[in-house]
């Protein structure tokens, strides 16, 4: 059976990188994209100069300013970021049509059957990185492997502006040395659980008795054990029919209570509106949609039919309902709208 050739591309602090590209004076100072320190604004991203001070995405602007008083926070320009994303995807399509976007600045590419560079995934990744730097003016990191999990970990391995290639022969050795925090779904609380079991790297997880893992992680245990062995059969999925429009964020530190969850909701809703900007979705909006993933990996989703003008208050109410179902620390929040086919839903629902 032929090994797949998967590339994971991830731009380095994307929004901030675009701003630094357009204003080189920003390159050497700590800066971030977000709202003002007054109120409940949070950051979308921060450059590496700011991250030295502990500034991170989804952090309240007021907290970031306390960590780094010299931090420059600018509002950002979603249209500019979307254009850069479109330029990146145009480059991707020169090498494959099998592209799975994860966000504006991140995507999986399946180049298994690409004829470019005699089918060399490494050469393709090198060329994509070079072209994006030349044509878009920003750096991206890339991981090349036989599956999505290892490719994504590899793209993080040498950030920023790095390329990590994991050949089939080196795959098990590579994944064995990967800290478990790199596994998707492993947050702070899960790391603490694993640490209590003596698990810090995937090699530790490989050696752990499956029944012990299952007792602590339930239905997640099989996926964790597979990833720890470097096994991931998920295909690169090309979405052909949009059934929803949404944004979500996985937090580097779990949100401990409802108040912290409500504090990050405004930036998610702002990003959602920006994603909808200039796109003719309003006549198709049928339901509000909110997702919460807790620190124990359990997930809850709430939907509510749209019966009047769109209101951010509905998302706040849905968040309260979702949080009340578990009342545990939260590692991910997603907000969005379900879409109906245009011919079935013709309401005009402007934002208020």
Curated annotation (Swiss-Prot):
CDD domains cross-referenced by the UniProt entry: PolY_Pol_IV_kappa
InterPro entries in alphabetical order: DNA/RNA_pol_sf, DNA_pol_Y-fam_lit_finger_sf, DNA_pol_Y-fam_little_finger, DNA_polymerase-Y, DNApol_IV, IMS_HHH_1, Rev_trsase/Diguanyl_cyclase, UmuC
Keyword Metal-binding attached: yes
Cofactor binding summary note: Binds 2 magnesium ions per subunit.
Keywords linked to the UniProt accession: Cytoplasm, DNA damage, DNA repair, DNA replication, DNA-binding, DNA-directed DNA polymerase, Magnesium, Metal-binding, Mutator protein, Nucleotidyltransferase, Transferase
One Pfam family hit: IMS_C
GO molecular function: damaged DNA binding; DNA-directed DNA polymerase activity; magnesium ion binding
Record: residues binding Mg(2+): 10, 105
GO biological process: DNA-templated DNA replication; error-prone translesion synthesis; SOS response
Catalyzed reactions per annotation: DNA(n) + a 2'-deoxyribonucleoside 5'-triphosphate = DNA(n+1) + diphosphate
Main location as per UniProt: cytoplasm
Localization per Swiss-Prot or TrEMBL: Cytoplasm
Residues in UmuC domain copies: 6-187
Active site: 106
Enzyme Commission designation: 2.7.7.7
Gene Ontology cellular component terms for the protein in this record: cytosol
Substrate discrimination, annotated site positions: 15
Reported cofactor(s): Mg(2+)
Annotated family: Belongs to the DNA polymerase type-Y family.
NCBIfam families: PRK02406.1 (NF002677)
Subunit field text: Monomer.
Function per UniProt: Poorly processive, error-prone DNA polymerase involved in untargeted mutagenesis. Copies undamaged DNA at stalled replication forks, which arise in vivo from mismatched or misaligned primer ends. These misaligned primers can be extended by PolIV. Exhibits no 3'-5' exonuclease (proofreading) activity. May be involved in translesional synthesis, in conjunction with the beta clamp from PolIII.
Protein name per Swiss-Prot or TrEMBL: DNA polymerase IV
Organism expressing this protein natively: Marinomonas sp. (strain MWYL1)
């Amino acid at each position: 059976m032929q090994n797949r050739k998967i590339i994971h591309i991830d731009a380095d602090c994307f929004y901030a990188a675009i701003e630094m590209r357009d204003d080189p004076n920003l390159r050497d100072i700590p800066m971030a994209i977000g709202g003002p320190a007054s109120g409940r604004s949070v950051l979308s991203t921060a450059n590496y100069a700011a991250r030295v001070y502990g500034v991170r995405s989804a952090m309240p602007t007021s907290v970031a300013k306390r960590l780094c008083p010299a931090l420059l926070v600018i509002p950002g320009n979603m249209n500019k970021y979307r254009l850069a994303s479109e330029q990146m995807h145009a480059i991707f399509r020169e090498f494959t049509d099998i592209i799975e976007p994860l966000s504006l600045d991140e995507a999986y590419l399946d180049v298994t059957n690409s004829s470019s560079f005699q089918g060399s995934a490494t050469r393709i990744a090198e060329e994509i990185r070079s072209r994006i730097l030349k044509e878009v003016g920003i750096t991206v990191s890339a991981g090349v492997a036989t599956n999505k999990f290892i490719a994504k970990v590899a793209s993080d391995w040498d950030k920023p502006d790095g390329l990590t290639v994991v050949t089939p022969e080196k795959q098990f050795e590579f994944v064995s040395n990967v800290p478990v925090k790199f596994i998707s779904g492993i947050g702070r609380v899960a790391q603490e659980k694993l640490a209590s079991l003596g698990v810090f790297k995937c090699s530790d997880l490989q050696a752990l008795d499956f029944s012990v893992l299952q007792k602590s992680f339930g239905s997640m245990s099989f996926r964790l054990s597979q990833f720890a062995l470097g096994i991931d059969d998920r295909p690169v999925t090309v979405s052909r029919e949009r059934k929803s429009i949404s944004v979500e964020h996985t937090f580097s530190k779990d949100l401990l209570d409802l108040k912290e969850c409500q504090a990050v909701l405004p930036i998610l809703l702002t990003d959602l509106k920006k994603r909808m900007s200039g796109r003719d979705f309003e006549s198709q909006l049928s339901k509000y949609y909110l997702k919460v993933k807790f620190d124990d990996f359990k997930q809850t989703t709430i939907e509510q039919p749209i019966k009047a003008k769109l209101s951010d208050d509905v998302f706040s109410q849905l968040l309260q309902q979702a949080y009340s179902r578990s009342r545990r620390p939260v590692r991910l929040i997603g907000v969005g709208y379900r879409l109906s086919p245009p011919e079935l839903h013709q309401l005009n629902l402007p934002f208020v």
